[in-house]
Amino acid sequence: MGPQQDRSAAKPYANGSTAAAAAAGRKENNKVVRYRECQRNHAASIGGHAVDGCREFMASGADGTAAALLCAACGCHQSFHRREVEAAAAECDCSSDTSSGTGRR
């Protein structure tokens, strides 16, 4: 057996970032990611096309566990579900006063 590794240390990704940095980046973007209908082709092995009809991904376990990546409804991995990214509503002052009278007619 080899030497014991410290599993509490941050594990870097291939690009050099850590899991904590990646999670912080997701929060900074203010985007909401939802996984919609399952697109897994259950009849691919026989040359057909059949989907199971699952309409939205529901995690079967708590966040951070392996079960969180499996859908409770259809049993498929999260990657089979269509990914939908929604940008959070930007805060803006929508009260514009355009009645300055300098526009063309």
From Swiss-Prot:
UniProt cross-references to InterPro entries, sorted A to Z: ZF_HD_homeobox_Cys/His_dimer (IPR006456)
Cellular location(s): Cytoplasm
Residue segments, region Disordered: 1-29
Swiss-Prot/TrEMBL GO biological process terms: regulation of developmental process
GO MF term set: DNA-binding transcription factor activity; transcription cis-regulatory region binding; zinc ion binding
This protein's UniProt keywords: Cytoplasm, Metal-binding, Zinc, Zinc-finger
Pfam families for the chain: ZF-HD_dimer
One Gene Ontology cellular component annotation held by this UniProt entry: nucleus
Zinc finger (ZF-HD dimerization-type): 35-84
Main location: cytoplasm
Function: Inhibits zinc finger homeodomain (ZHD) transcription factors, by interacting with them to prevent both their nuclear localization and their DNA-binding properties.
Annotated PANTHER family: MINI ZINC FINGER PROTEIN 2 (PTHR31948:SF162), ZINC-FINGER HOMEODOMAIN PROTEIN 2 (PTHR31948)
Assembly behavior: Homo- and heterodimers.
NCBIfam families tied to this protein: ZF_HD_prot_N
The protein's name: Mini zinc finger protein 2
Organism: Oryza sativa subsp. indica (Rice)
Organismal lineage: Eukaryota, Viridiplantae, Streptophyta, Embryophyta, Tracheophyta
Gene responsible for this protein: MIF2
